[in-house]
Amino acid sequence: MKKIRHYYLAAVIQSALLAVASPVARAQDATTDGYVTRKEYEELKAQMLAMKKELDAIKKEKGAIPKQESAEGQAIVDMHKEVAPPVVEPEGPMLGTTKFYIAGWGEGMFEARNGSVSTFSASFNPIFLWELSPKLLFESRLEIEPSGSGTNVNLVYAQLTYLLNDYITLGVGEFFSPSNVFVERFEAQWINKLPDRPLAVYHGILPNISVGAEVRGGFPIGPTRANYALYVSNGPTLNTFDPRTAGTLDFSSYTDNNDDKAIGGRVGFLPVPGVEVGYGFEPAKPGFQGTTFAHVRSLVQSVDLDVTRDSDLLKGRINLYAQYAWSKVDHAVYDPDGSLGFGPLAFTSKRDGGYAEVAYRPTKMDTDFIRNLEMIFRWDHLSRAPSGLGAPEEERWTLGLDYWLSPSTVVKAAYEWDNPRGERNRNALLLQAAMGF
């Protein structure tokens, strides 16, 4: 830059000298006619050529500087490429590009039941949700609870789900049986409004868990809506060895006992917002392959109702849940040779049971304490064991009162009148605190 300034300074000085020298030359060689002499012309021409050469040299030197800087910059870029080559992004999802979430609940309970010692219990149920992509999801739940001197950890369900479109979802793995609405929707202890679970739909008639594949979804029908769930899974096992349970179905079959698979499902209809009715079914062959029970067939059916209403007259919200189920197993002969000590015993197995529950919460009251209370009444029923040698018919009536500390934290108190036919009562006081997260 100093050199450039010197060139400019030289040009200015030369111009000044030319301006001073010109009058002198003209005074010495001036002509009387006013024209420039040949000598003056040659001097001016020489000065102009010298100035042009100097300006060309300055321009050339200025143009070389950006080229040098550009070359240095390119060299730095090339060096970066050699030291840190570009990262190639993989086509599939990477850890950090997916979404992972933990939900679930924890609960503690006290139970004092007639005929049994009172006891405390607790459990923790984490639910793991993993979104591998907007269409591919994984969900799993564990049940962790103390047992004796150790801890029991049970896998409740684990399912991989693919969202095909707005109306069809595909799933495979271990999942809640769609025909059992209570287990699928209300089984979580911070959602279940009473400390214990109803008869029949939880244990006895309906399946809780299925291992297989399912397709489910929903769609509008004019102003109404409908939903569906269809599945194929390992079927139930027919109990044949114990007289108390002979003819009943065991749905805890994580491996099948024959090549025939259970095919079941549920269809729901919502005629108006807040009201849903449903029908569930599961036909199967529950007998062991290669035995006299191999061709015995079973059918489980259920109906359910779910109503939610806000009432200005009652200043609160009313919930009504109900489900009733029936199971039937074809005629069969149990212990045909008497080797088990209770046969031969021949019968067609039929059993039924269900529950109805109504809850009221005064959500429109002005006082916070009253708004957080909820009153519950439930009736549940289970018919006797089909063999006539097992559990008797059982009917229960339960009154409960809940206090909600937050939308997912509740303290419950309930008293249950439990009257198995022909046996002494098993009435119980139940207390529970549960928190969902």
Model-predicted regions and their roles:
Residues 24-110:
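N-terminal periplasmic/intermembrane-space "pro-region" immediately following the signal or transit peptide
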Residues 88-238, 259-263, 268-277, 352-365, ...:
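Outer membrane beta-barrel
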Residues 204, 252, 256, 347:
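Glycine- and other small-residue-rich loops at beta-strand/loop junctions that grip anionic moieties
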